[in-house]
């Protein structure tokens, strides 16, 4: 189904300056949050335990919280409903235990006065493992950005490659800061959301860059701004339909999904909006700011064609025994 029977060329680049200014302000605010407030590290990165408990009656959340607060070594315990009124999720930082102590048994003993229950899941991550996971998570984001830059450089040119990475860094910073704003623990779910966002956002950007290249190869115009406007306008229907589809799916996950996946669903929801916006207004504009020019492009293409023709001529001379 098409939203528009005829493609109307919209002047996206005319308004892109405002988009860049707004993005610059948002990124500065986001960096302020990241550096001065920082993330609240989840169990995956800081170490700790996660306990899933099911009661035969409605779970006494307040009573469970009070029971843990009485214990000196259980600091920063979080208790929340999980899926149903009978089930709760208990999170607490890493607790040092003696060799003959069983943390599972200690928790069960603390919960005894709260009623009939069953511990359905008990996961513990040590501080060393958490630190390794954090390092690997950061490394995976950096490697993803480098790999994308290399790929786009080979497929297009360095200006497009750098522009796409700038847009992706913009997306990652804004979405990462939203994790702080909405008080979500930084864990592997958030890293998974950021990596998914990188793949989703670059896909939109590549489609627009592909159409820009088609406009250039057709040589209908020698104006870079016009070529970009035509490329974005011709792919706008596809971009909006894809983005809205992803947006509504992730919105359902946010509203009806379990709290345990909020670290993935909420960053993805925000990332869908930010990624679509950056693909349209940020990446093409950055390419222009870096000096992308149709005249230079045609000159480079002409040099490539001339070089290829010279190689072909030399090959024929060599095969004919004249060299």
Curated annotation (Swiss-Prot):
A family per Pfam: Sec_GG
Source taxon at top rank: Bacteria
Molecular function as annotated in GO: protein-transporting ATPase activity
UniProt entry keywords in alphabetical sequence: Cell inner membrane, Cell membrane, Membrane, Protein transport, Translocation, Transmembrane, Transmembrane helix, Transport
Gene3D superfamilies the UniProt entry points to: Multidrug efflux transporter AcrB transmembrane domain
Xref: InterPro entries: SecD/SecF_arch_bac (IPR022813), SecD/SecF_bac (IPR022645), SecD/SecF_CS (IPR022646), SecD_SecF_C (IPR048634), SecD_SecF_C_bact (IPR055344), SecF_bac (IPR005665)
Free-text function comment from the UniProt entry: Part of the Sec protein translocase complex. Interacts with the SecYEG preprotein conducting channel. SecDF uses the proton motive force (PMF) to complete protein translocation after the ATP-dependent function of SecA.
Name of the protein in question: Protein translocase subunit SecF
Gene field: secF
